[in-house]
Amino acid sequence: MKIIHVIIAAVYKEGFGYQENILPAKHVELGLDTHVVSFNKEYTLGTEYTNADGIKVSLLPINESKFTKMRYLVSFVKKTRGLFDYMEKEKPDIIFIHGLQAIDILEVCKWCKKHKNVKLYVDQHADYYNSPINKLTTLLYYKIVYGYIAKQLSKYAIKFWGVTPWRVDYLQKVYGVKQKKIDLLVMGGDEKYIDWGNRNFVRETIRKKYDIPQNAFLVISGGKIDETKNIHLLIDAVEKIKNKNIYLLIFGNMTTDMEEYCKPKINGNIKYVGWISSKQVYPLFLASDLSVFPGTHSVLWEQSLACGLPGIFKDWNGGFNHVDCGGNAILIKNITEDTLNENIQLLMDNKAMYDKMKDIAEYKAREHFLYINIAKKAIDIK
């Protein structure tokens, strides 16, 4: 069975841990003849190759029309050339579109109209934070242009996937997709890099590497650290905890202002390891007792859950409440130094409460956030 992942709304890049990289790789593992069609500005004339995961990648020639250089017209012009012809050549059984925000997607609709038996799925990552509707013109633009694309896709799509509850809501209220066609498809962690069977050994090894006692209560956080991530508040909250057995492990790049604020506070119990790759994140999660992500969302939230880790997260008015699978997570609306301190202290002091969270994290949430399971759900296979 042949599946084509259509990645036109964004540029396709190899070697990243994004959903558009991982889902096709998982479909290869599941035995599907897996293709990606996209574009990359380094290959203006297009190219074809098979990558290390066994995915057949076709980068289409870029549309170099003068209209693509005009700010107010660029969104009305196709980014690529030859998408319909590519579909005609490959004749997929399944199409999975990553993001509908490209006029090129209408070429897929045209092909689906001709081939009624194809199974079409669409996901999207836009929400009220990363694609804010701050002007009437923006709202009209999204509703008219992207709403039209969504309407055409709705004629053929089996399912529109939002990757968070917020993005499910956005599909319906902004793009006008009918609720019965929308569902949640979470992001997750790549089980290929999660050494679950040897997690105790991984835990011991990582803690030795960073000089963290084996019996310490280890909190972890990180990512692209700017003020919106609120990791500076987490550092202050941990500093206030009098229990010397608590440690905080932070990873990721810091903006200049966060470096100036946070780095003087890095000491014996607060560890900073700098930037690490997405693959290197998983052992750190396995070595930890609690993740805390008190700011803006990133896929690190779901990656920590895929490692069976209980967590504390910022509550964005229910926009990311999918992280709670029945008790593995605490969601805090008002993130302050004090609210973080209180909740971390609570879990340290109340072992029964923490153990219950950990059990749910390991035996329920973990499976839900593994990409092999997400890849099956994405295209309705068992």
Feature roles, as predicted:
Residues I4, W161, P213-K229, I235-V238, ...:
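Conserved donor-binding/catalytic core segment of Leloir-type glycosyltransferases
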Residues I22, K110, K114, Y128, ...:
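Membrane-proximal helix-turn-helix segments that form the acceptor-binding/catalytic region
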Residues K119, Y146-F201:
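Donor nucleotide-sugar binding/catalytic pocket of nucleotide-sugar-dependent glycosyltransferases
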Residues E259-Q280:
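Nucleotide-activated donor-binding/catalytic signature segment of Leloir-type glycosyltransferases, i.e.
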Residues W275-I276, Y282-S288, S304:
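Short alpha-helical donor nucleotide-sugar binding micro-motif in glycosyltransferases
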Residues L286-T296, L309-P310:
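Acidic donor-binding loop of glycosyltransferase active sites
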